[in-house]
Amino acid sequence: MKAEGIVPDVITFAGNGEPTIHPEFGGIIDDTIATRDRFFPDAKIAVLSNSTMLQKEEVFQALNKIEDNILKLDSVLDSRIRQIDVPNSPAFNFESLLKQLCRFNGNLIIQTMFLKGEVNGKSVNNMTEEEIAGWISALKQISPKQVMIYTIDRETPVKALKKATKEELDAIAERARKEGFDVTVSY
């Protein structure tokens, strides 16, 4: 790449699956940092994570070494987290997630997907006043360096889910900005 004049600005771990589940995640990040430092020292390293493995110390330490650890916080309600993110562990809950996110001392980016609709006959809407007020309260505790909000971008396995509108996302972003957060919105 370097010989061809192609220089990456970001090396991103994402895709089909959760990158932090890999048993050698910490070593992979260390190797990536070393390779980046050798060949492309100006490139950032980013990991997009659903936040379900933050309780593993190796995962926490590895994410804290990179420039952009982008961690999901889709709801402050346990029942909604189960609907939206479908965590594997029955013990996964908002309170433990909040504690893990706070451990980063602001060295993280929070990413939240807003949506509404129905899953298995139950209403899903993480844009209610209760949800948004709780989300902003959580952001105040977490103190992320940036907040990214977005909505569904492609076909979902559940047809009854709907995108948040541009107006809804803009209103949520404005509330967070009024609290001092750097917010980016993707429609």
Predicted regions and their residues:
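Conserved alpha-helical substructure of the radical SAM core
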Residues: M1-T12, P23-G27
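Conserved AdoMet/S-adenosylmethionine-binding subsite of the radical SAM
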Residues: I21-K162
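Binuclear metal-ion centers of metallo-dependent hydrolases, dominated by the metallo-beta-lactamase
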Residues: T165-Y187
